[in-house]
């Protein structure tokens, strides 16, 4: 399977987010970055695992995303790997997100980071944390689907 899908190239994927959270809605957001961060992202040195987004003062912030320092530039001009980065969303999207996060107690999680027409984009999702029994149910359902597919394939 190719990394290129409909004009964008996926750089990092947070697969664990779909296991830990029930995804309700997804949004595409731009991200405010420095030059060395963009170079490092293009090299694929990003970790989204522990990241989450916060809404503060009417703005969205991406927290705890690790972007490794860029090796070609010295230590002096490099960025801090886990700094807080601003997400760029439309005002209407921000209002909608603020309402849902504050009233319904939902969480904003980054699902994937990709390049779209040369710009770095982050796919963020409104998610509701799963309990242990929900995770087990999902695993059981997935296993049952695989068994059904195997049985259908043999006939």
Swiss-Prot record:
Main location: cytoplasm
GO terms classed as biological process: trans-translation
A GO CC annotation given for this chain: cytosol
Highest taxon of source: Bacteria
Region feature Disordered, mapped onto this chain: 136-155
Gene Ontology MF terms: RNA binding
Cross-referenced SUPFAM superfamilies: Small protein B (SmpB)
Keywords (A to Z) from UniProt: Cytoplasm, RNA-binding
Subcellular location: Cytoplasm
Function: Required for rescue of stalled ribosomes mediated by trans-translation. Binds to transfer-messenger RNA (tmRNA), required for stable association of tmRNA with ribosomes. tmRNA and SmpB together mimic tRNA shape, replacing the anticodon stem-loop with SmpB. tmRNA is encoded by the ssrA gene; the 2 termini fold to resemble tRNA(Ala) and it encodes a 'tag peptide', a short internal open reading frame. During trans-translation Ala-aminoacylated tmRNA acts like a tRNA, entering the A-site of stalled ribosomes, displacing the stalled mRNA.
Family: Belongs to the SmpB family.
Name of the protein in its database record: SsrA-binding protein
Organism: Nostoc punctiforme (strain ATCC 29133 / PCC 73102)
